[in-house]
Amino acid sequence: AMIRSNGEYCGIAYLMPANDPSVSGIGFSVTAWSCLSSQTFAHELGHNMGCCHAPNDGGGCTTGGLFPQSVGHRFNGSSGTQYRTVMAYSPGARIDNFSNPLVNFDNAPTGIAPSGSDAGRDNAGSIVLTNQARRAMYKV
């Protein structure tokens, strides 16, 4: 990951294309210094770990992430407030969580468990599944 002083975009990153250490050459992202407080850094690293935006968000990540469930999530909490996880675009107040059906925020799940033909929304689970390949990508 690289932090730059300025630029046209807050961030840009390669989407991890395979759960394999051979893709280590594209484990790269760039975030603008002025966007660090807006969760852009975590969002761009999410792409490097195979995570995609919420369905229908676009933004160069329209076909989903590394796995079918590797997508962000937008949801309404019990207070009626709409929220979005780290990988989802607005609308909604962004929370500091990757989509995960096992974690609640405002008494609502921050992801969707797979069910029938719906693969669900679970970027946190996808990050766990890519752990071995990521170790090879992020060498110091």
Identify the meaning behind each predicted range.
Residues 1-140:
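Extracellular (secreted or membrane-anchored) zinc-dependent metallopeptidases
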